[in-house]
Amino acid sequence: MLLDAQRFFNRSFSINVICELKHNVNTRRKFEIKDWPTIMLVSRNDKPKISSEEVTHFIDDYKKRRKTQMTRFFGITIFTLITCRIAMKKMITAKVPLNTFQANYASRTQTITHTQKSLAGSLLAATGMTLGIFGMGITGTCWSWDVSSFQELKQRLERRANNEFVVTNMPLDKRSQQVVDSLVKTHNSSLCK
């Protein structure tokens, strides 16, 4: 069976601890957070066997995942900044050099194709700016919620809509505490290297 537990530790960031408990070789099932009391009852006689390599592998995957989320956010931020800069250039009024006897209110004559091109460019710049701002909001929220896929986002939004409580601050049983302690110990030793 797979146990999916979430626990705050070491500088108050959450990490998803995945450990495999061998209760029955033929039966493997992923438990959700709402199944937590059932997991504790079922897994009392099981001993989690997690090697330091698995923990290190998990921590590396977690760091890659967070780096990917950060890269997405900063990529869309750079896109937004570029489109905002283009939109600013489009909004600057065209300066027309005046002749000696020309009135200040006389406008420059433009062809229809030039006007259509400037309108199309302005529309594209405004669309890019709007998409960039919404993209920054979405990727920033996903980065802060630690969401990397649409399925995870759906689960997170369902939890928030149902007001389910998170078990991060609840006391753990002895074996789960051993797993968390081994993760903390391995994480601290990997920082010292």
Curated annotation (Swiss-Prot):
Protein known as: Uncharacterized protein YBL059W
InterPro entries for this protein: AIM11
Key words of the record: Membrane, Mitochondrion, Transmembrane, Transmembrane helix
Transmembrane segments: 119-143
N-terminal signal peptide: none
Compartment(s): Mitochondrion membrane
Other known facts: Present with 623 molecules/cell in log phase SD medium.
A cellular component annotation (GO) from this entry: mitochondrial membrane
Location, primary (coarse class): mitochondrion
Mode of membrane association: Single-pass membrane protein
Record organism: Saccharomyces cerevisiae (strain ATCC 204508 / S288c)
